[in-house]
Amino acid sequence: MKRAGNILAALQLALVVGHASAAEPPAVSVAQLAGSTLSAVAFVPRTAGMPGGGELARIMLQAYLAPDGRAVVRVWDTGRAAYTAPAERRWSLSGSTFCLDVPLAGPRPICADIHIWGPRIAGVGAKPYAMLDGDLQRGNVLGVH
């Protein structure tokens, strides 16, 4: 037990030192998202009617983020082993909080405080909890509008 406590203390120290010395990533802008396709995995609280078990549901998605706030979104349907038909939804960015309406995610959009590094995008949100991890590719790789 003492060894585990020492390891935990060392990890906490590394986290504090790393956080203090790490530069903040640049602010996220709409220009980084608009006109791109997001391919990502999101973890959200499981709601009634969602397949699977456990507290969190994993949603694999692709979304073309149009410059006007529209999004064309498709989600991987594990039961069919195929993507759902693309559906028109909405997306927004307020500060660093990115929100995307996603089929199968329940009545609320997935919202996360995001960071973007090159093609990578990742973030975590609260109320409700959400985790997003994926990449961005310029253009509409879904091929639908």
Mark where each language-model region is.
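Lipid interaction determinants
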Residues: 18-88, 92, 97-145
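Positively charged n-region of N-terminal signal peptides that target proteins for export
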Residues: 1-4
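Bacterial N-terminal signal peptides
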Residues: 8-18
